[in-house]
Amino acid sequence: MDLKTTCSNIWLTKFERKGIKPEFKPVFVRFIGTNNVDEYNDVMKTLQSKVEANPNISVLFDGEIPLDGELAILFGKQLDTINSNHIELSDIDGLFPQGSVLNQMYVDSLNYVIDLAEKNENFPNQNIQKNFVKKMIVWTYSYIKQNDIHFDESQNPKCIYYGDISKHEIYFLILL
């Protein structure tokens, strides 16, 4: 699938995307380089316009995922007591609406990313791992909660990142 087609398809509803494939599956695509700079610039402008037109289901990162220092300090103190090897539902209280199925889905996804990072990063000590977990939670709060990203039955939220990417940013995209 080419860049232009992918750009168009991610904005289809879940129902419309089922028509492309036998079942709906989230899309995770990466493109490295392009043969046509003009097409790339057109697609990037289209993506930016789509994100601006759909702020409740979209977030766009341009070259980095900034970390809000104030939130990091606020959450840092609250999260000092968590077990960074396994997050519980009570550890993320208030991240999503009370009773929302998203809370458990987020905890499951966060634990998946923590396990993945533990296997690949070999954190030298517990504090470094805990800071990694805090960063994932602060980023989620900053870009999902504060932007009021909607999760509903018909439209899947979109997350677009372009530019050089760090390992932690990759883990965050996996988490989403």
Task: Identify the residue ranges that each predicted region occupies.
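Active-site and donor-binding regions of nucleotide-sugar-utilizing enzymes
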Residues: D108, E118-L175
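Ligand-binding pocket scaffold of soluble enzyme catalytic domains
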Residues: E16
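Conserved N-terminal ligand/cofactor-binding loop architecture of enzyme catalytic domains
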Residues: M1-L12, I20-I137
